[in-house]
Amino acid sequence: MDRYDMEDVVVAPPAECSSPLKEWRLKRQAGTLDRSDIIEFLKRESPKYFDYQTSATVKDTNVITLKCMFKESLAKEEIIDVVVEFMLGDNPSSALEKLRLEGNTATVCGKVFKNGEPTYSCRECGVDPTCVLCVNCFKRSAHRFHKYKMSTSGGGGCCDCGDDEAWKKDQYCELHLANRKNPLESKILTDAVLERVEICFGAILAFCVSYLEIEPNASLQCLDGNVEGGQVDGAQYCTVLYNDESHTFDQVIQTLTKIAKCRAKDAMEIVAAIDREGRAVVKCDTFEECNKLKVSIENQMILPTSLVSTARNNQSLRTSVLHIGAVACQQFALQLLGWFQEFLVRHYLFRKTFSELVQRKQETFCIRHILEYDVKLWKTARTCWHRLLISGMLMEYDNKMILAQEFSRRYATIVEDFISDDHDHAFSIVSLSVQLFTVPSIAHHLIAHEGIFDKLLHTFYHVAIEKFIRNKTLHFSKNIASLTFFKRANYILYDLRYLLSLKPDVLSNDLRNGFLEGCRALMRVLNVMQGMESMTRQTGQHMDYEPEWECAFNLHIKLATTISQVIDWASGDVKLLRKLYKMTMRALVSNSFIVGGEKVMQPKKVADHVANCLVYDISVQPVSIHLPLSRFFAGIYLHLGAHDLTYDGLQTETEALSIKLTPREIIEPVLCTQAMIAQVGAGLWRRNGYTLLHQLYFYRNVRCRVEMLDRDIACLQIGASLMESNEFLIHVLNRFNTIPWLQENYWSLLSGNEMNDDIIREASIFDEFLELLIVIIGERWMPGVSMVTEEDRLRKEIIQLLCIKPYSHSELSRALPDGNSGNSDNVFEEVINTVAVFKKPVGADSKGVYELKEHLLKEFNMYFYHYTKEDKSKAEELQRERRKAKKQLVCCPPPMLPKLTPAFTPMANILQCPVFLNICSLIMERALNAYSRSFTESHLQKVLHLLGYAIQEELSEHYPFLSFYERSQEYGILEKLEELARCPRLEAHYDFVLWTIERFKQLQAKQAPSDGRAGPSCSQQGTGGKLSLSAEEQAREERENRARLAAERRAHIMAQMQKAQKSFISSNAEMFADTENETRKESASTGPMDWEDIPPEEEQGAVALESKVACLGPDRKFYHGTDDTFKCILCFENCAISRGGRQLVSSAFVQTSRVIFTTPNLRNSQSALHISCCGHVMHYSCWLEYFTNEEFKELRRPHRNRAALAQAANVEFQCPYCRTLSNAIIPVTETLPAFSAPPSPNESYLPLDSFVEIMSTLAIELGNVKDHELTTLPSVSNILRLSGVVGGLAQFERSVQLIKNPPRLHADYIEGIEFLKKALLNTMKIQQSHLKDHPAIESIEMVPILWDSCSYTLQALEIYLYAVEKPLKAELSMRHQSCARNLVRACSRSSALEWETDLPLLPPMRSQAEFSSRLLDTIFNQNDTSVLEWDCFRVLVPFQFGVLNLMVPEKGYKTIIPSGSMFDFYIMQTMFLAQLTKAVLCFDVEKEKAKRAEKAPNSELTQLDYIEQLPSRIRDNMIDFYRRYNIPARVLQKTKQKQLVEEESEENQGHGQTVVIPCESHHLALLLEYVQRQMSSFLRCSCLFYRFLTDVDFPDTFPTDQPDRFDLMCQYLGLDPMLGVYFDMETVYATMMHSFASHPHIDREVEQRCQPDARRSLQVEPCLRPLPRLKVLCDDFSDLINSVSDIFCPNNEREEMKTPTMCLICGLILCGQSYCCQPELGKVSVGACTHHAHACGAEVGIFLRIRDCQVVYLGRGKGCFVPPPYLDEYGETDMGLRRGNPLRLSQAAYRKIYLQWLGHGLHGEIARLNDNANVAAAAQWHHM
């Protein structure tokens, strides 16, 4: 247990002289028992169970380690159990069991959620999103089959199962449904028992209140020296440090280490305990010492860590000095409250008693007191009281109502306390509001009878905004948004949202009156918000500083939902609506922003119509984005029509109350805002800074637009419906200041001048005016404006969004405003399914998207008011492409409009009024005037859009008064359109003009029968003949003609170019002839070997010959060819690999790895080095210059946010070309066979047995020389002589391919290799230094480290290829191919070290000789590990590179470069035989039979025919070898032999029979199949290795889409695929296999297996290592999150893990929370995950943060978040569970993570994501 958590420690019980139980019973009988008796008992007993220990550290006696503990289990036995026994009688456990069987627990679950616990809400049945279920109830309820959401609790809430008001149906789970049937009475809880219960409950409550409230006066009480009998002088006091949310962990740790003299580790544990519990004891000593520490801590000056400091931030840490007795009583009180909460759940009568007690106002523990003193408590104490109230008061409705009433009455006080406090909202009593205000009946009761609506807003007004009101308007000061008090005050608005979340069906008079009282308070808030943060246009100079704007928008965002809810409530009740309308009008009249004060009017004339306009110049007078009062009026007005209320009817009532407001005054503030937005677009407000741009962005943003932009448009539509159309348009034109712009004579004066800025601005503003007019007329999908529903409005919004692009589900839901109802998700899904088709995701990286149904594309509106400019551009382009593809007119015509409601019908008149027609006519005239300077094409496009609306409105016949066609004739609209169609300058709008004319013709045809006068003149008829109803066909024909002419023009130009080209060739014939000859020569001879054409009849034979390509052995194919040419990625110079040229290198990345060791084996700490590279080539000198610069930049980089472990072993840099993470280089060299001359066909070589003898002799010779005497290598001629190879030096030299006078290694090459080796060594040092039992750094062998890295890298590549199902012949990526090729070549070249015979051995060569000596001794002389312990491929590589170059003849300058010589083949054969032997030894016939029966019971053995065809001699040898050496067979034989001996001894028979293990042909066939399977990985690795060593490509016979075949791989390696050959006793093969199989270690292993209890000493390396896998995850994410809901932190058994994190490599669950679990890694404290990653993944790990549904890649002090493998039904991730959709495991997404890990790409992915992330401060990943 953590010492600061007061955990249970069992000690002997204290001796008691008398029993308190007897005393209480006697007093009870006498009637003198009082609760004070029990309180005294609790007070007296609790200090006995508190203890502490102090100890000084060995290094520093001043550093004290303190350990405090409260023995909870003992306190329960000795105190709580005594009280329970008094209440329930002598056998309390029996009584409690009977109570449980009665089943009167509760019909409401009421489980209190802990932080991070999973919760479930039903989207179909939940009344609102706050209605949740716990795991147990959810699993037993019908909701698990519905559409549900899952999230994690912040702590403090409770389960709503059983609450009738929380669910529309299925209110009970199976468990709580049963409890409904149980009666509320109890036979066990008699009146006498309940009397005792009442006394005990009262005592418990009084004790807890008394002792948990002593904090403020704690130090003063201590001075009395009398607290619980303690003395001031004794060591009886504690200094207690409290939690606050203002100081950081690091600040508190620093204070503890500096002042309290704690160790850093102890300080971390204290801080973790303070964060968890809310306080911790930091010192136990005398009062004087404790007080001194308290004063020191309080006087400590802590600098603020953030730029914005809060008031609390500047205060000192909160401490107090308490008597130990007081601390003990407090600790026991916390335990008592926890027990009490659980006890109350046991029966209804317990809760009834509790409720009655806390309702007594004279008691110290009444509800009022508990609510008000919450702020004085620390975190744990608060949580205990909250849980007690939930369990005691929220289970029954009556109790809940009582608590809600008391909570409402004290609301203002507790909220003010919360605002001045610094604890999080979840730890405040205010957080109970969600439990109370979301119950509809309680919320409505509180509004009606407690005035809670008014009280909430009054409190908010008083605490949050009153102090910022100047001149009746809000003006927030700078940085107010970041002040804590304002953020905390906003929780009041959340409570208001809960309160109004469910609208009642019917409003009672009390509820209506209470609601109206709240609305008055709301009007007061909206009144001061009207015009807040107003701006005045800056002229002359830029603003000095950016004014505050965020706070106003935050206030709007928090209040917007409430405003929508209030309007929604009012919409359903005509009385409420009428009164609220009058209230709003009164507020508007009283507000003076823009329309207040003296109104100056001025007449304005347009098209012979005059209107009196309000004089207000927005260019010089204040304007504001914030007009909530005007917008609230618009929201209310839209609902009048539903109740047959009209503006005129209500106007009479308001005028009677002296409230008079004309429509033009209503719309004026909104018009000013729209005009200001237009001016901003024209660039007139650019000196007002970014503040204005930010505000305009949020004005249109989805979070704000419902109560901003949408309401503004509705307000203007109201104005358009109430005002005469011409007057309305003149008002709008006047406000945009564009009336002069419409005068023709005014613009004709300017037409001859050059364009200037003012004209451009005016044109831009008029453009904005036209767009606003389009929006006012067209955006009528609003209930109340048109005959549409909310679903229609949502449908329109979705259609317009999907016209931009296909959207994923989350993108679409984010692009739509939040609904107020709890089931808005269901509505959204119903609507989306009617308009779009869901395309499922393809692949791991894609999301599912919705695509708009084809027939709805015609509803696209280019000027949709929620489009940004970018959206508009994208949507228009997409629409044009679609129409072009369908061969329709390429334009974006306006959609059909819904019918207006009666109140808004006058708005349609705008489309036929003279001012409108005058504007349209004028724009078209200017469009036709080539010299007009006052026209832009955008004007024409918008006018055509408006005309389209007008035509379609008349065609719809919704409005009898609409006669657009007739009036348009007066202005010659059709004639102008036809002129536009003929105007070549306006070709871009040709199709739109044609569409408009076509619609006009439809209207004309409709009008013709009814009105003859409407027919056009003769000239018009003539034009109409040409432009008939088939205008679209004519347009298409014209487009095709234009396309044909363009194609002819292109063909003519191409013919001219070809003619010129032929002319040039003929004039330069000689030059082209030379080029052809060169090309012919190059193609004829590709190298030293000339390829001849193969006649058709010989082709078959050629293929057969080609199929036997081998890279090793006597039939080896010798490589001929040229190396590739490259381009240096730094200097871009073309370069080829040449011995005399500049050295080339490729950047590489070295990392420690355990990927292929993660399969279950005994070597848990085994790791290796892996090398990867991207393959891009550069000159060494270019790279060195680049690297030096990168190194310098790294040194200059600030290291503040990086821990010691973040410093990488090697300087990391990125490939200059592809930015791949690198920390080393690999030299690029030419092909290895190029160094050796091709052998002659008739040359002889030393045989395999001579090779074996030579190797054995070399091992002995090297072993005989002591290390310090090894100055020269043994003589080759001497070794040959001792091996019995007489006169074979020439053969030896041919067999090893000795190179005489080899080329010298380039100096840059040597430097490059040294750099690579240094990188490998550094990486290994860093990894091993962090291991607990790490070897000495000096013991790391430098020689084999490169070879071992090469073998591991190739093994990792082979496993990766196997995992992605790629055979060897399949095309390798450039990354893998270049890495393997360059690495193998580098190993081979560096192993051929140059040395002269007269020079002593250099240290590297000596180390190599020592290493080779041990290696050869192990392989050939059986002096170390056995073949069972070898990873044969990792032995093969160092054998290949480390041995042969030790045998260079003495005379001359010579070397051996491994490249596929005969000795290289023998090395391969040796290791092949070793692997074969191991496979035969490990074969278990019974297991193989069982596997075969399970997979394919009736399949035939493929090798059976081969076995039966073998000579009996070889078959007998195989049987003999199997019986003699196979380990399971030997164990079985010994076991049976032992049994036989025992049986014979019992029967007194002494025949001495020997048990013979059966081995038939089918056994041998099974064995060969097993061997082939077990050797597949070794052979694939070997093929890869020798492919790059010899540069002989895989033959075409290798499969490209099927698994690699054993026989083909053997042929490629020069081996005999017929395994029977190796069991011929007349060959050296059998001898070698017998040698491998007869190792003493193997005999010992057999003996140990015969004894089941014996400890195994042999670590068997499997022949075929199992494929590494990540942890298998649950298919359903809810199962995974539930599985960790009860896991406790390893450092604190009482505290559940806050952030359970699963290692996906091994499946271990770790605590991902900082500080509570901090082991040390290399003397640095790190997080549990970082520590685990070093052990489990060799410095890199993959972790799943379960409750956040996040995957973390964790590297060396760095990390990144990647998408988790859990996806919802729409193919999307949900990191943080924000959307809450049910998640299921996506195998494709998990496989992507798996392949990144298997392919060693985690470090690179971390670097890539961190480079791309825009993170200002680096996260401290090492603390994870």
UniProtKB/Swiss-Prot annotation:
Pathway the protein takes part in: Protein modification; protein ubiquitination
Q: What is this protein called?
A: E3 ubiquitin-protein ligase UBR1
Q: What is the native source organism of this protein?
A: Drosophila melanogaster
Annotated segments matching region Disordered: 1006-1043, 1073-1093
Tell me the protein family, please: Belongs to the E3 ubiquitin-protein ligase UBR1-like family.
The lineage's top-level taxon is Eukaryota
Entry GO MF terms: ubiquitin protein ligase activity; ubiquitin-protein transferase activity; zinc ion binding
One GO term of the cellular component aspect? ubiquitin ligase complex
Q: Can you quote the domain comment?
A: The RING-H2 zinc finger is an atypical RING finger with a His ligand in place of the fourth Cys of the classical motif.
In residue numbers, where are the RING-type zinc fingers?
1126-1220
SMART domains for this protein: ZnF_UBR1
Q: Upper lineage ranks?
A: Eukaryota, Metazoa, Ecdysozoa, Arthropoda, Hexapoda
Instruction: Mark the UBR-type zinc finger spans by residue number.
Output: 107-178
Q: Outline what the protein does.
A: E3 ubiquitin-protein ligase which is a component of the N-end rule pathway. Recognizes and binds to proteins bearing specific N-terminal residues that are destabilizing according to the N-end rule, leading to their ubiquitination and subsequent degradation.
Question: What InterPro entries does this protein's entry cite?
Answer: ClpS_core, E3_ELL-like, E3_ligase_UBR-like_C, Ribosomal_bL12_C/ClpS-like, UBR1-like, UBR1-like_winged-helix, WH_DNA-bd_sf, Znf_UBR
Reaction catalyzed: S-ubiquitinyl-[E2 ubiquitin-conjugating enzyme]-L-cysteine + [acceptor protein]-L-lysine = [E2 ubiquitin-conjugating enzyme]-L-cysteine + N(6)-ubiquitinyl-[acceptor protein]-L-lysine
**Which stretches are tagged as biased composition: Basic and acidic residues?**
1033-1043
A GO BP term, please?
protein ubiquitination
Give the Enzyme Commission number.
2.3.2.27
Q: Which residues form the signal peptide?
A: none
